[in-house]
UniProtKB/Swiss-Prot annotation:
GTP binds at residues 21-28, 68-72, 128-131. Residues 204-206 form a propeptide. It holds the Pfam family Ras. It catalyses: GTP + H2O = GDP + phosphate + H(+). A lipid is attached at C203 (S-geranylgeranyl cysteine). This is Ras-related protein O-RAL. CDD domains: RalA_RalB (cd04139). Residues 180-206 are annotated as: Disordered.
Amino acid sequence: MAANKNKNQSSLALHKVIMVGSGGVGKSALTLQFMYDEFVEDYEPTKADSYRKKVVLDGEEVQIDILDTAGQEDYAAIRDNYFRSGEGFLCVFSITEQESFTATVEFREQILRVKAEEDKIPLLLVGNKSDLEDRRQVSIEEARSKAEEWGVQYVETSAKTRANVDKVFFDLMREVRAKKMSENKDKNGKKSSRNKKSLRERCCIL
């Protein structure tokens, strides 16, 4: 029975999501809220924690693998390895901390550098702690402008109230899925072209 369960899970589509952003912006809180429906306020700084969950995405059962990475500068060197394995990224800042918003530029540049061979990288800009509106330092207009400049979606979340938590993970999975489908289509198209060319060559020889 366990073997069948593992077999079923391994046959599900797996989408790999990486959480990036400065320390203390709530990456772990967002992840834990999505995974377990609970708000964890005090959380030890993360080096890298991995989580996996089975979800239903637009009627299809899939698995999401979430890697929650450290925002601290001490871990900057090892982030490259984590970024290479990622298929989609949630670039998180706190709306109550201007510095964390400014830092998203550097995180995105690191992602683009590591994934330089890829075309469009699935990424969402996420402004967390929307429940702390009275302490806001980053305006919605400023964040939207940055997202528009990057060609990505901007969403505000609250790990505390769970506002838009599911939305950011599911929207990102949709982008990852669309990219995979596009890449598979391109591969199949090239393969088909090679087969036709090979067939024409064989016909000429005959």
